[in-house]
Design a protein with these regions (language model features):
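Hydrophobic alpha-helical transmembrane bundles of multi-pass membrane proteins
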Residues: 1-297
Length: 297
């Protein structure tokens, strides 16, 4: 994969294949009770868990006033599969064929990240039950898993051609078009912000808990169905973004590629607990994560 236009093409279209594998297992692959208790493949009747929602004629695909959230999760989890593959694509650039990448993209997008998501997000997941794992906005469930998957591939592929000099000193390979990189990263900022908001659904009634009997007082919830607020996660998103940008600018001595990339890195570093942190904590975590990433590169 060397052509500039080939990367976005395969990134967008790979899930035309992975899609069918992902939705063919409505109850998961059945590797452990923490995923689901049973495994069911290619079942489209009501005998399988939520399988009836996966067909094109279901109410989920149209306006259904009795269901406010299923469509959001349906699209969000597809987006997660897509994101996992896109992270891998950036890591293996110039060293892999499209066919090989397609196989790996289907593997990470259809199988591996879903297992990790079951462990860390499902109420029966062992990471959640035994370790108290908390990852409200996919910091580890998506980005860490995809990064680890990419690292395993790179251990086989090796570095990019020209990355190291004959003496073993690493060379900096900058972006081909800094302007497009800048635009793309700012679009990702906006999309990530929207993802944060979409992950917080106003379905949790705190009226009785606050002693307001007969009064409905809705607040937002995350994937763990714990209360949070759109205001709080917005502040934390912006502060982790700001911390990443600031740290990237300072440590890279004003390099625009690293500055803007560090903004995204700051958000990802703090996303696991951005529904819990104080905004200053989010900023500090974002800064520390960027410093570590820059030193490791």
């Amino acid at each position: 994969m060397k052509n500039t236009m080939l990367i976005p093409l395969v990134t967008v279209t790979w899930f035309l294949f992975g899609w069918w594998i992902y939705w063919a297992f409505p109850t998961g692959p059945g590797l452990a009770p923490s995923i689901m208790n049973e495994s069911a493949a290619l079942i489209t009747d009501e005998s399988a868990f939520s399988a009836k929602w996966y067909v094109a004629t279901s109410d989920l695909m149209a306006v259904n006033l009795g269901d406010h959230i299923s469509g959001v999760f349906w699209a969000a989890f597809l987006l997660f599969s897509w994101t996992a593959a896109s992270i891998v694509s950036g890591a293996v650039i110039e060293r892999i064929t499209v066919f090989a990448f397609g196989i790996l993209a289907i593997a990470i997008g259809s199988v591996f990240w879903t297992i990790d998501a079951a462990w860390g997000w499902h109420f029966d997941g062992w990471m959640l039950k035994l370790l108290g794992y908390h990852d409200a906005y996919a910091s580890g469930v998506i980005h860490a898993v995809a990064g680890g998957f990419a690292l395993g591939i790179l251990a086989v592929l090796g570095p990019r051609i020209g990355k190291f000099s004959s003496s073993g000193e690493p060379r900096n390979i900058g972006p081909r078009n800094p302007w497009l990189v800048t635009i793309g990263l700012f679009l990702i900022y906006t999309g990530f912000w929207g993802f944060y908001a979409a992950c917080n659904i106003p379905i949790f009634d705190l009226g009785p808990e606050y002693g307001m009997e007969g009064v409905t007082y809705f607040t937002a919830t995350n994937i763990y169905v714990t209360p949070t607020t759109l205001s709080g996660i917005t502040f934390n998103f912006l502060m982790s973004l700001s911390g990443g940008l600031l740290a990237g600018y300072v440590i890279s001595k004003g390099d625009p590629f690293w500055t803007y990339s560090s903004g995204l890195a700051g958000v990802i570093c703090a996303s696991a607990g951005n529904d819990l942190y104080h905004p200053i904590q989010s900023m500090i975590i974002g800064m520390i994560g960027v410093v570590v990433a820059y030193k490791l590169h």
